[in-house]
């Protein structure tokens, strides 16, 4: 059975969403393990804030890159479908 562009695109979108959700869940678990701020020294509080910001930024960048790759794969898949169509039905 041949895969349509819509099926391929939907599957990539679903995988992107699932991966993003899992990353957010992992981050939430990590952030939940943070000690109570009232017990932290100012230096450690600053350290945790920087680390959390870094994790959020890297997660955002990674998800953006994953989305870009998915869009690239969708484009390539569409091109392959066009090539296949042109090979099956060459114009006279």
From Swiss-Prot:
It holds the Pfam family KMP11. It comes from the Eukaryota. Its main location: cytoplasm. InterPro entries: KMP11. It is found in: Cytoplasm, Cytoskeleton; Cell projection, Cilium, Flagellum. Keywords: Calcium, Cell projection, Cilium, Cytoplasm, Cytoskeleton, Flagellum, Microtubule. GO terms for cellular component: cytoplasm; microtubule; microtubule cytoskeleton; motile cilium. The keyword Cytoplasm applies. Belongs to the KMP-11 family. This is Kinetoplastid membrane protein 11C. It comes from Leishmania infantum.
């Amino acid at each position: 059975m041949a895969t349509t562009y819509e099926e391929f695109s939907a599957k990539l979108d679903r995988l992107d969403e699932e991966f993003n959700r899992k990353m957010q869940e992992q981050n939430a678990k990590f952030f939940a393990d943070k000690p109570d701020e009232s017990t932290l020294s100012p230096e450690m509080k600053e350290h945790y804030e920087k680390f959390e910001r870094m994790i959020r930024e890297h997660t955002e960048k990674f998800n953006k890159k994953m989305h870009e790759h998915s869009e690239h794969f969708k484009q390539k898949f569409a091109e392959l479908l066009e090539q296949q169509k042109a090979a099956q039905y060459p114009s006279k």
